[in-house]
Amino acid sequence: MKTRTLALMGAAAALALSVGLALAGPGEPGHSHKSFAAGEPGDPTKPVARTIEVTMKETDDAKMLFEPNKVEIKRGEQVKFVLRNHGQVDHEFMLDSIENNAKHKVQMQKNPDMEHDDPNGKRLTPKDSNEIVWRFTKAGTFEFACLIPGHYESGMHGTVVVK
């Protein structure tokens, strides 16, 4: 009886795993079923049109900022953002629409320690660096922002204009 029960449990587990893998779809780089306002995750195996270095830091007069804070991109371009936290506190880079970042900012007020390692956002500790490869498939004005409570209000946001 034990052997039969174990065999049935094993078969059920295998079936559940195969159904989950089938629903997951292809695992190719840059492929995602999630929709993003600012485009889609890029494919790191393909060349980028350019690399944009973005520095995060605080100033002596208590401001927090990104350098640069405005970027212009051609629709269809794949770019690599190299993110560097030169500050003394954690910062994040969230790329989305202004409206979506505003909604996310409300969530961050409730959970300020929320970690980000998403296709469109990264949280960095001081002196840390990371990268985001992104393909801008939609024209418009988008925003990158640090949504850690108080950082946006201290000036930590920028604009991406896609033409």
Feature names for model-found ranges:
Residues L83-N85:
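Asparagine-centered strand-capping/turn motif at beta-strand->loop junctions
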Residues Q88-P126, Y152-G155, T159:
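Histidine- and aromatic-enriched segments that form or immediately flank copper-ligand environments
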Residues P47-Q78:
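N-terminal edge beta-strand
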Residues P44-P47, R75-E77, R135-A139, K163:
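A short, structured loop/turn motif at beta-sheet edges
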Residues G25-H33, D118-K163:
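Extracellular/periplasmic metallocenter environments
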